[in-house]
């Protein structure tokens, strides 16, 4: 048995030891397919709270499939591997439960919902999630106060509340509206699937400003993109290169610049053909 002085020394060392930040999202050896076509082929990834991870790669690498599988969209079958989100088995949950747990997917092509205005849609979505978590639903006044706070943070106008969901919106307006939805729903993990697709530079900056305004110690982002230009405005902590359904290289923001300079050809010697496995 240690003497009191030894016990005190052990206690002080334990206090001095840095506490490791828990992992928010842990993906291990994830395999997924659509029909007979396997798309994800052993993908592993760890994301900690507050981090921004960029997922880059050539067309057909599996970037959007990763986001869709995490969100639980129909048509994808997970055949192997595991996904833990805040210590819970994400793959066992339906899409609504995943959203209530704090996962948000911003679509590459946001859909229009004619005749349903943003206020009604967002209040219904938010209260459904609050109810699923056992929280009290917001009444009209509480909700209006919340959305006006979020509009101010994102420098958006009140008129957005009265428009139909993405109805008649330009590409940039649709993407800004999704960032507004993200702000109101306050997820723990936001997956942005090629948010920069089809945007001119002004719209891109506007969307990036919105994302940066929502960054925080408790919110993580997976930024899925084909091009480096989005990462000029949303600075990632980690950049991953996805090719043939696997992450083949990870690094800091400089990796995105390397891809911009040399393209994806340098990956060819890193991707092992299935026939050779």
Predicted regions and their residues:
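Conserved beta-strand-loop-alpha-helix hinge in the C-terminal portion
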Residues: 238, 242, 246-269
